[in-house]
């Protein structure tokens, strides 16, 4: 197996690379950002530049791809977000596929955002795809392109639709849990949209990495929801964070319709043979210690 991981310098890619090195699994990383890893294992390149990718001789031998590279943009300018998402998430993926002539297996990191507003809970993989933001739209388009491409090229495709992944340090604050932690740490009231009773099976980063490793050791094609073991409410999250920090910061409630978002992870358990280990309380405690 000759493995390539895109987005190797990102939060998930960085943690994955550490685990792979620990388990002595050989890999090649690709990222636009230079990091401090062994330079022999990293290709510094931009997936939006096909000509540059085609010059990379090491890519010709790759037969297994873990595609983590993605653009998550918090810009308020919808046009700018759209252009960047198309450029990186969609065009970048197409360029990547065109520069890897010997692919046999692909694992694509997608997102729960492809579903949009749940029609029912728990959400199965065959749920209608109606994303409510540009990031989700770009993931749906990329999924569909990969399905057509892989069918034509006879490549085994696996799609992981990750629930919100938490457990990173404070520089990663686009998810509810790190936002809540930052607020409570600074004695600021976190904002809760709705009544705070909405449930979601957040996924701790170590479990996300272990799910990828499990796939790597025994590849299974298909689409899988990858979510955590528990389904806490936002109020429960804030309570756990307060307890760990020995604080009593109360939230601000903003009236807004909210929905439970609970992924059905039965296929993950039955077919992938993977079960998340980190309970929400332990995950929150570990995350707080990183801030």
Each language-model region and where it sits:
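N-terminal Rossmann NAD(P)H-binding glycine-rich loop of SDR-like oxidoreductase domains
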Residues: 3-23
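Flexible, glycine-rich beta-alpha linker
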Residues: 115-116, 130-134, 158-175
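C-terminal substrate-binding subdomain of Rossmann-fold SDR/epimerase-dehydratase oxidoreductases
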Residues: 184, 188-291
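Active-site helix of classical SDR
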Residues: 138-141
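Conserved beta-loop-beta element that borders a ligand/cofactor-binding pocket
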Residues: 110-111, 143-168
């Amino acid at each position: 197996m000759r493995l390539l991981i895109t987005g190797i310098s990102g939060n998930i890619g960085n943690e994955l690379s550490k685990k792979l090195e620990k388990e002595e699994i050989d890999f090649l990383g690709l990222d636009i950002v230079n990091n401090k890893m062994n330079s022999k294992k990293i290709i510094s390149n931009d997936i939006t530049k096909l000509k540059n990718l085609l010059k990379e001789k090491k890519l010709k031998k790759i037969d297994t791809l873990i595609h983590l590279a993605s653009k998550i943009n918090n810009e308020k300018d919808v046009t700018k977000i759209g252009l960047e998402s198309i450029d990186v998430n969609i065009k970048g993926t197409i360029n990547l596929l065109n520069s890897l002539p010997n692919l046999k297996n692909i694992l694509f990191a997608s997102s729960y955002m492809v579903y949009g507003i749940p029609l029912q809970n728990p959400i199965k993989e065959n749920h209608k795809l109606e994303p409510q933001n540009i990031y989700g739209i770009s993931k749906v388009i990329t999924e569909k392109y990969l399905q057509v491409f892989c069918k034509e090229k006879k490549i085994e495709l696996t799609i992981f639709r990750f629930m919100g992944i938490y457990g990173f340090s404070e520089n990663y604050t686009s998810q509810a849990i790190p936002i809540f932690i930052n607020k409570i740490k600074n004695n600021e009231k976190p904002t809760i949209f709705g009544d705070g009773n909405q449930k979601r099976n957040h996924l701790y980063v170590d479990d996300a990495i272990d799910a990828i490793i499990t796939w790597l050791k025994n590849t299974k094609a298909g689409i899988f929801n990858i979510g955590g073991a528990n389904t806490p409410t936002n109020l429960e999250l804030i309570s756990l964070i307060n307890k760990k920090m020995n604080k009593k910061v109360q939230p601000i409630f903003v009236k807004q319709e909210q929905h439970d978002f609970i992924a059905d992870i039965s296929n993950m358990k039955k077919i992938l043979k993977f079960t998340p280990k980190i309970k929400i309380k332990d995950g929150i405690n570990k995350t707080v210690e990183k801030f």
